[in-house]
Regions:
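Aspartate-rich (DDxxD/NDxxD/DxxxD) Mg2+/diphosphate-binding motifs
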Residues: 9-11, 21, 58, 62-97
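Short, Lys/Arg-rich, polar N-terminal cytosolic tail immediately upstream
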Residues: 1-22
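Membrane-embedded alpha-helical segments that form the functional core of polytopic membrane enzymes
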Residues: 47-69, 113-126
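Intramembrane alpha-helical segments
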Residues: 83-134
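Helix-coil boundary and interhelical linker segments in multi-pass alpha-helical membrane proteins
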Residues: 38-57, 99-115
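Transmembrane helix-loop junctions in multipass membrane proteins, especially transporters and channels
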Residues: 45-49, 71, 75-79, 110, ...
Length: 134
C-alpha cells in the first residue's frame, strides 16, 4: 500500500477540482481567525450585529480566500492544480472587496479603522507573497 504525506492535516486527498478549492480555504485556520472577530464583538460594551456580520465577511474575504490564494500562488504549499490566473483573481478580488468593506465601515463608523484596513491589505499581500523573502 502506497501512502502520500498530505500537505496539511485537514487537506483532502487530491483527485478533484472542488477539493483543491476547499483545501485552499484552510478551513480550520479560517474559522480560527473568524472566531477572533466574534470574540472581539463579544467583549464590546454592546454588540452591533450588522457590524459583526460585515466584519466577518471582510475577514473571510481577506484571510479565508485572498491570503490563502496568494499563499498558494507563492510556492504551491498545498499542491493544488488551480490555474495561476485564477489564484491571482482569488487573491486580489476578495482582498479588494474586504478593503472596500473596511473603507465603508470607516465612513459609517469611525475613520480610526482606516489605518487597520490599509495595514491589513498591505500585510496580506506582502506576507503571503513573501515580498521580503522571509
Amino acid at each position: 500500500m502506497r501512502t502520500e504525506k498530505a500537505p496539511a492535516f485537514y487537506a483532502m486527498a487530491a483527485g478533484s477540482v472542488w477539493k483543491d478549492y476547499v483545501n485552499l480555504l484552510h478551513l480550520p485556520y479560517t474559522l480560527w481567525h473568524l472566531s477572533y472577530v466574534v470574540l472581539g464583538a463579544a467583549i464590546a460594551p454592546s454588540i452591533h450585529l450588522d457590524r459583526l456580520l460585515v466584519t466577518l465577511l471582510a475577514f473571510f474575504l481577506a484571510v479565508g480566500i485572498g491570503a490563502h490564494a496568494l499563499d498558494e500562488l507563492n510556492g504551491r504549499p498545498l499542491g493544488t492544480r488551480i490555474p495561476r490566473p485564477v489564484l491571482v483573481g482569488l487573491g486580489f478580488a476578495p482582498l479588494a472587496g474586504a478593503v472596500i468593506l473596511g473603507a465603508a465601515g470607516a465612513v459609517v463608523g469611525t475613520m480610526w479603522v482606516l489605518p487597520f484596513v490599509a495595514f491589513g491589505g498591505f500585510i496580506v499581500i506582502a506576507y503571503n507573497l513573501g515580498l521580503w523573502n522571509g
